[in-house]
Amino acid sequence: MVIKAQSPAGFAEEYIIESIWNNRFPPGSILPAERELSELIGVTRTTLREVLQRLARDGWLTIQHGKPTKVNNFWETSGLNILETLARLDHDSVPQLIDNLLAVRTNIATIFVRTAIRHHPEKAQEILARAKTVDDNAEAFTALDYGIFRGLAFASGNPIYGLILNGLKGLYTRVGRYYFSNPEARKLALTFYNKLSTLCDTESYDQVLECLRTYGKESGAIWHSMQGTMPSDLAEARR
C-alpha cells in the first residue's frame, strides 16, 4: 500500500479507504475499535474520529452511537464525490470510468441543453458566448467546457442537473486538462459551441439532440486516440 498523503488526517483517510478497496476491511465488516485502529494507523484518536466522520458523510462507513462502525458497500451508499478516489485506487479502470463519465454527460446534456436553449435562449447565448474569448490552451478550455455544460444545466431551470455536474467536477477537470491539450479537441469544441449558438438563434430545438450526439461521438474518438499516452497520474488526488 503506497500512501502519498502528507497530513495525519490525510494518511488515515487514505489508509482506511485503500483498506476497504483492497478488502482488508470488506463491505459489511466491522472496523477495529477506535483505540486499536488509531494505533494501527499511527494517528491520535481525535484525528481518527474526525476522519471516520468524514468517511461516513461520503458513504464509506456507517456510524451509529453505541454500535461498532460498519463498512458500507460504497457503490450503493456513496455519491459522485468519490469518482476521483476510485480513479486513484484502480488505475486500470480509469479509461472505462472516464468513458462512463463522458457517456453520462452526453446523455443528460441531451435533456438540459435542449431545455435551456428552448426556454431560456438569452441565458443560453450568454453562456455560449464565453467561447468567443477563450485562450487557446488546455487549462482555459477545460474551465470553459465545464462552465458551459454546468451553466446550461442550471439554465435549464432544473438545478438537479447542475448538482450532478458539480459532482463530476473533480474528475471532469483532470480529464479535460489532458483531453484539451490536443489542438483538434479544442477546435472540435469551438465548432460545437458555435453550432449550439446557431441552433439557439434559429430556434432549431429539434436539432440539439443530434448535435450533442455527434459531438459525443467525435470527441469520444479523439479521446480514445489519446488513451495510449494518458499519463499514469491523471487521477492522482491533490492532498
From Swiss-Prot:
DNA-binding region ranges: 34-53
PROSITE patterns documented for this protein: HTH_GNTR
GO cellular component: cytoplasm
Protein's UniProt keywords contain Cytoplasm: yes
One example GO MF annotation: DNA binding
Keywords from the UniProt entry: Activator, Cytoplasm, DNA-binding, Fatty acid metabolism, Lipid metabolism, Repressor, Transcription, Transcription regulation
Main location: cytoplasm
Stored Gene3D superfamilies: GntR ligand-binding domain-like, Winged helix-like DNA-binding domain superfamily/Winged helix DNA-binding domain
Annotated localization: Cytoplasm
Domain HTH gntR-type, chain residue ranges per copy: 6-74
GO terms for biological process, alphabetical: fatty acid metabolic process; regulation of fatty acid metabolic process
Task performed by this protein: Multifunctional regulator of fatty acid metabolism. Represses transcription of at least eight genes required for fatty acid transport and beta-oxidation including fadA, fadB, fadD, fadL and fadE. Activates transcription of at least three genes required for unsaturated fatty acid biosynthesis: fabA, fabB and iclR, the gene encoding the transcriptional regulator of the aceBAK operon encoding the glyoxylate shunt enzymes. Binding of FadR is specifically inhibited by long chain fatty acyl-CoA compounds.
PANTHER family: FATTY ACID METABOLISM REGULATOR PROTEIN, TRANSCRIPTIONAL REGULATOR, GNTR FAMILY
Protein name stated in the entry: Fatty acid metabolism regulator protein
Species lineage: Bacteria, Pseudomonadati, Pseudomonadota, Gammaproteobacteria, Enterobacterales
